[in-house]
Amino acid sequence: MEQLCIPERIQSIIGTKAHSVDNVGMSDSQVRIYNEFVLKIQAQSTETNNEAEIARWVGNKLPIPTIIEYCVVNGISYTLMTKIDGEMLCSAEYLEQPKRLIKLVAQGLKKLWKIDVKACPYQTSRLSERLKIAEYNVNNNLVDLSSAEPETFGENGFADSKELLKWLKNNQPEEDIVLTHGDYCLPNIFVKENKISGFIDIGKMGPADRWQDIAIAIRSLKHNFDGKYTGGDKIFDFNPQMLLDELNINFDEQKYKYYILLDELF
């Protein structure tokens, strides 16, 4: 990222306070962790705008960071927010207790689904809007094929991102709308005293099909347990049905496949 010029409104708050840099996760943002707040710096996008707006709409309905300041300078967004208490669900403490971890993932989903989204004015998370963003990403060479699941592209998969986009447009499933996080993976879920204490990285949050979050959660659990994200040995033989049993939901192979493939274009 180019040399940064922290906006005065934010600089006046953080001053010269000490901070660390958070390198957990797969986003291209720079995240600075202070004692009492977090500063996230990244290229401006639909998601950065949505994060500030959806946070105001959600308010105290969910444990999410409070936005202190949001500024955009030269195409770079700066979001200063309160810091969430607790530990990420991808921490060793939880990965070493798989059944407990899976219950907590389900607890977080249920918490999201309890929120009434009928009056939510932000619709960028709906499938029709997500496909528009996906098309923009494809047309502007913003899709990172190296991070895709091995079966998505290649001999038995799609030829390229354009072919995948065409398939997604032609195979849209009916939506069962709930409030979704949008990127419901373990690093974005915090726990304290065995309860969900917060959700972070909410730029994709909004009304969408519940399988948007279920699919990403299953993938995150699978790869955190099999060592792909940690770089270590396999910890646990995860079966998606373990999470679905906690949610009392049957496996929907069509929607699972669809939302995993959709995420490949982001």
Where are these regions (language model features)?
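Hydrophobic HxD+1 residue recognition
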Residues: 184
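Hydrophobic residue at the +6 position relative to the catalytic HRD Asp in the kinase catalytic loop
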Residues: 187-191
